[in-house]
Amino acid sequence: MAWGWWRRWRRWPARRWRRRRRRRPLRRRRAGRPARRYRRRRTVRTRRRRWGRRRYRRGWRRRTYVRKGRHRKKKKRLILRQWQPATRRRCTITGYLPIVFCGHTKGNKNYALHSDDYTPQGQPFGGALSTTSFSLKVLFDQHQRGLNKWSFPNDQLDLARYRGCKFIFYRTKQTDWIGQYDISEPYKLDKYSCPNYHPGNLIKAKHKFLIPSYDTNPRGRQKIIVKIPPPDLFVDKWYTQEDLCSVNLVSLAVSAASFLHPFGSPQTDNPCYTFQVLKEFYYQAIGFSATDESRNYVFNVLYEENSYWESNITPFYVINVKKGSNTXDYMSPXISDSHFRNKVNTNYNWYTYNAKSHKNDLHXLRRAYFKQLTTEGPQQTSSEKGYASQWTTPTTDAYEYHLGMFSTIFLAPDRPVPRFPCAYQDVTYNPLMDKGVGNHVWFQYNTKADTQLIVTGGSCKAHIEDIPLWAAFYGYSDFIESELGPFVDAETVGLICVICPYTKPPMYNKTNPMMGYVFYDRNFGDGKWIDGRGKIEPYWQVRWRPEMLFQETVMADIVQTGPFSYKDELKNSTLVAKYKFYFTWGGNMMFQQTIKNPCKTDGRPTDSDRHPRGIQVADPEQMGPRWVFHSFDWRRGYLSEGAIKRLHEKPLDYESYFTQPKRPRIFPPTEAAEGEFREPEKGSYSEEERSQASAEEQATEETVLLLKRRLREQRKLEQQLQFLTREMFKTQAGLHINPMLLSQR
């Protein structure tokens, strides 16, 4: 061959060096297992190219040679040692819980806040939204109710370690669900939390889980599994159960939704909603603190406008009204039919009633109604012929039921002649047109005279702005109830005001942009109670005025107009969840042996069946190192004197079984109510209790009582200093917990 000499003597160009591939050492096999025998690699038939393998012949390529690489000096391994208790036991807390229970007409309520309510049978229960927060204290409370089981007792090991949890949601037949979990602080509800949990906003969230119904997705898995790691700020180390008890482990927000009909129910032909709003002349005298001049102005408008009396109920409340104590006598003054009613035809735009000329008689008749309900009633006269219920008599008759400012004569929505002017206006809301910008929603007490929005000062509570109404009203009434606390009846102490320029007509006044509008439901306008019954108690007949109690239905209907909202067409919808929380108990266990006489029994008949092992679960708050026996407490077969003295100081917890919490434990705290209504620490005390008595009190108080008071203050101060010292020692030892995780404490 002509080029043979070149191939014999010419060396090929040197290959480009590359690092030699390091061989992994063979994994050490488990002892006792035979080595896996070699199997010939299975051949795979491949399609060959028609013209053979493509080769790059243009130019020449260097041939690569393998050169032994130079390895960097390996750094020394750092061995991190963590202290472990002598005894460690894994514990799985498994339980079932109705995360959401929504009765009919409760579509805008929060079930977590009402989960412990005693609702009478026949009335709806719960809500479509549930915001729950889980901690070791909540799990123990669920165990006391028989809703979970613990795989290993916690009464012998005082240390704990949290390793995460898992929730299993079971799909329902007709209702869809959407949820979101949170493991970041703060675990609190603010005024914008519930609007963000509306299905229309939650469907757009990045981190969420969907639970479709069988009607939406007939196929698929029967359950949705959600695995949740420990909190972000939680340091994985050993804590005492006493410290870990109040740590928030996870917060869940689950809401009922509708994936099949996101923008309207098939039972309706219109996505809009119409409700009634008071006219603007009411808003200067809406509260108790309004002046007599402003109230008289409202009565002058109502009693001088004949069109406002065009109602079917007018003759029953005005003409020839008889007394309640004696139906044979007429109230004074007696207004006859011939004087008050005109003989005209309303088809020709004539007013039926002549109220303007009987203005003074109407005022006197309203006062007569008020006397029949208060001073002349059985509750004041203590008559044996009637039921004497005791309640405080109002100071004004402006809110009388029959002829007061908010009588059904003026506010009934179904008018016999709709074209006549009335004391309210019909407002229509289209959720698709609500941009949110310029909307204002707030709650104010009945003591506020007008409906002017005051951002600073605290007179307007839970002020929400720039949010669509279908999201702002979601869980809003329950948030107000949690803000005001468990000792305030939020439904009867105030009302909700709204500013919304996206309704028709707009609930917005250009000349007075900060004036709020008050809406009410149909039952209040018809003079009925919230459940539709027409019998009104005398207590409410002298207090007939707009309250948040009479605004719940309107808020629920507006919430249903939002996208993906729950349509509330079923008797109830329930979402059941199974949870598993993984803990590890640790400590220095003292093994106790219970030895019985094998030759004698306790008198009960023997049973060949195997009984389940009883798990003793103790309150985690009572499982600190101070209240548990350890192996080092034994000295020569006996407990040491210090251990016995330490256990004698343990408080008894029998009373905690009968006392109910002020709010459900699974309900997370709110920002305003956290410091005011949370459960007090043991040994904590308020500023009023620590304050010293004034000089006048010391002069009148006896010396013995004063010394006892000083001694009580000193003991409380001692407990507080002991708590502060104990927390300081925990911080120095690295056993403290991030305070941001203790919002429920």
From Swiss-Prot:
Keywords: Capsid protein, T=1 icosahedral capsid protein, Virion
Residue ranges with Basic and acidic residues bias: 599-612, 675-691
Region feature (Disordered): 23-44, 598-619, 660-700
Protein name (record): Capsid protein
Role, per record: Self assemble to form an icosahedral capsid.
Keyword Metal-binding appears in the UniProt entry: no
Pfam family, one: TT_ORF1
Location of this chain's protein in the cell: Virion
Biological source species: Torque teno virus (isolate Human/Japan/SANBAN/1999) (TTV)
Cellular component aspect of the GO annotation: T=1 icosahedral viral capsid
Family: Belongs to the anelloviridae capsid protein family.
